[in-house]
């Protein structure tokens, strides 16, 4: 048996949400009552910190490179079609398809740092469901903690994964 550990971290600046039309995604779930939006270029609006951190950790654990290649059409082996915004909900599913032949996910530990004004309790179950479906794992495999960030103008996610190489039959 070969076990490997991966670490992924994603951090973005956020700002108060001024208009209802802006979407705020965390863990594959649109946070409809969000008090924030990402404070960066709209072309990078597919920035779901949980998905990107977990994907990065999985790519690192399996020695397949940087999880950021998911958004880079020039370097990726996971081709994107069209607008990256529409691809965001499939980041984890695409990552899983890339690693599933050789690796089994034992567990994922996620720490989400988001200002306390944004209540996440109502969304935790939906985030668990999304991650479990995308990665074909059970809820017992995931641990999700939410805490206050040091900088109230940032959202960040730290993900640690443990994977096991699958034996060839």
Swiss-Prot record:
Domain of life: Bacteria
PANTHER family: 2-C-METHYL-D-ERYTHRITOL 2,4-CYCLODIPHOSPHATE SYNTHASE, CHLOROPLASTIC
Single GO BP term: terpenoid biosynthetic process
MF terms in GO: 2-C-methyl-D-erythritol 2,4-cyclodiphosphate synthase activity
Organism of this sequence: Mycoplasma pneumoniae (strain ATCC 29342 / M129 / Subtype 1)
InterPro entries: MECDP_synthase, MECDP_synthase_sf
Pfam families listed in its UniProt record: YgbB (PF02542)
Name of the protein described by the UniProt record: Uncharacterized protein MG459 homolog
């Amino acid at each position: 048996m070969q076990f490997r550990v991966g670490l992924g971290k994603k951090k973005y600046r956020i700002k108060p949400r001024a208009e209802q039309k802006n979407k705020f995604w965390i863990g594959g779930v649109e946070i409809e009552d969000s008090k924030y939006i990402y404070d960066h270029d709209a072309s990078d609006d597919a920035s779901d910190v949980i998905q990107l951190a977990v994907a990065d950790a999985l790519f690192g654990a399996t020695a397949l490179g940087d999880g950021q290649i998911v958004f880079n059409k020039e370097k990726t082996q996971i081709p994107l079609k069209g607008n990256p915004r529409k691809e965001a909900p499939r980041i984890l599913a695409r990552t899983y398809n890339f690693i599933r032949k050789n690796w089994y996910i034992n567990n994922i530990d996620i720490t989400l740092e988001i200002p306390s004004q944004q209540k996440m309790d109502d969304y935790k179950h939906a985030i668990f469901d999304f991650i479990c479906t995308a990665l074909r794992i059970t809820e017992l495999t995931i641990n999700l903690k939410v805490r206050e960030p040091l900088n109230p103008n940032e959202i960040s996610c730290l993900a640690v994964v443990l994977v096991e190489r699958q034996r060839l039959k």
